[in-house]
Amino acid sequence: MAQKHPSTSRSCASLRPNMESYILDELSARFGVGPSNGDPRSPHFSREGYLVASLFSKLPKSENTPEVRAQAALTKFLEADLRNARSNERLLFCEGYIHGKPISVILDRARSICASILGSGVDYRDVAMCGSFSGGASTSKKRGVSTAYFKFRELGDITERAMPYLERYVELTRYSELSDARGTLARVVPGNIFFTVPKNAETDRGACKEPDWNMFFQKGVGDYIRKRLKRVGCDLNDQTLNQRLARAGSIDGSLATIDLSAASDSNSISLIERIVPYELYAVLDDLRSPITRLPDGSDYTPNMFSSMGNGFTFELESLVFLSLTRAITSLFRVPGKVSVYGDDIIAPTDATPMLLDLLGYCGHRPNVDKSFTTGFFKESCGKHYFHGLDVTPVYVRRPLESRQNTFIQCRNRRGGAYTVKVPDRRRVIHLHNRLLHWGSLDGVVDPRLDGVIHELRSMIPEDFWGGRDVESIDAAVTPDLPRLRYHESFDRTDTSDEVVYLMCLNGSRTESTLVPKGAAFSEVATRRERKLCVSEITAGPGLLTSVTPRLQTRPNKTWLAKQ
């Protein structure tokens, strides 16, 4: 019988009582940084200080319960919509000036630019027919059963004004067969449903679950807008253009990076009507949700045109912001690059005073913490640069301890009992690997990270050492031998009608697999490979008669076959 391979890893890894405080204190001491070093606008800014200031900034605080964060997201959603109500009134008349230019003239130019991007002679009702279902949750289905299969197969939701689009879609496709069997096309609902997802330590992010068929047609229009934007150099499938421009702006200061606060919830109905050509606006207005159901069950009529969760919100806001930015640069004759990715805007530094005034008039507010119009620090699409150097920090977004077994009870040699926190292996591995990547810009790991790296590595069993991918959450990057994947192929060559049970002894655990006649069995071992020992391969009827290794490694497995 195979012997159990002794593990060299610690039997019980635990977290320090105040792991976050230890990491911050250790890094601050090793780097010699203080609070001022983490402020991008401070003359004492440094990459190391920025890491310390940002590392746990997105980790939810213990006193902020999920209910508190969800309520904060709802409050922010309603406050943004209150501003939309004022924007709707203001944009009806478009009175006032921005740096000597009438606002009405600027918005007319933006509308003209928007129309040129979209092209002419397009029937957007036909465009909506080219939609698709997403894998996200809807008003009728949870995320786990929200694939296209279930959304086509089961009865979906739709708003009343979007029903003509579904009727037309049924006429053009074979979906009519399924609808005839049901006797109805879809269930009519008033609108979408508000919900929240985790964002940072203070608040969640608000979004809305759209009716199934509304989302289907929304994505059709959104995909068309995305394709038209790509034709003019705004590729919403690629963030690297914004990132490259942000780096260029951090070198010479010629470009500004602007991030808008609650941008998806700040596109008022009047703004979209003022910027977007009527042919497209009419279709978008049919497909949007006119009513939002709040967590308390009440129905709310929003002043925003669409929210996050809508199938065309991202493309529509990109189109609007690109049109507004180009209107400013063309009317004020400011040269320079313009790029937009959602609410991340890159514009010439000289144009930012006028652009911010215009955005403010339209109901949008810049995120002060993430907008950099002066200086040499720039941030866009998740990348942060300072004088051309990548200073993007590492973020810990979830607690390092395991959620399933936060505490375990241990006993010391004297019989005393105590409890320790159990680390979440994947989160610890991810933090370990990301810190290694952050500290090795020149190919050599910063020795000042040694203390924290060794502390994190001590909480990772050695069976998960030897990784090579810094993005991995399953293997810690260490100098050890790589965690190779072992592949053995067992080919059955006899002609009997009997079946074969293949048993795998891995320590004290035994697994069995049924191998039918004429089939080949293969097993991939993902644990650290140790030793190859294939035993008791006995010839005879109904047995495996050949073993073909495909990769010569040292697996921590013992294989045997029996009748």
What are the residue ranges of the model-derived segments?
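C-terminal, non-catalytic extensions of nucleic-acid polymerases
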Residues: 1-204, 421-563
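Nucleotide/phosphate-binding sheet-loop regions of phosphoryl- and nucleotidyl-transfer enzymes
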Residues: 9, 177-180, 211, 215-218, ...
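Surface-exposed, low-hydrophobicity interaction/linker segments
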Residues: 156-158, 165-167, 171-173, 219, ...
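Active-site-proximal segment of RNA-dependent polymerases
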Residues: 204, 208-258
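Short helix/loop capping segments that flank catalytic or ligand/cofactor-binding pockets
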Residues: 205-207, 217-218, 265-268, 388-389
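Acidic/polar loop patches that form or flank catalytic/metal-binding clefts of enzymes
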Residues: 231-234, 366-370, 392-393
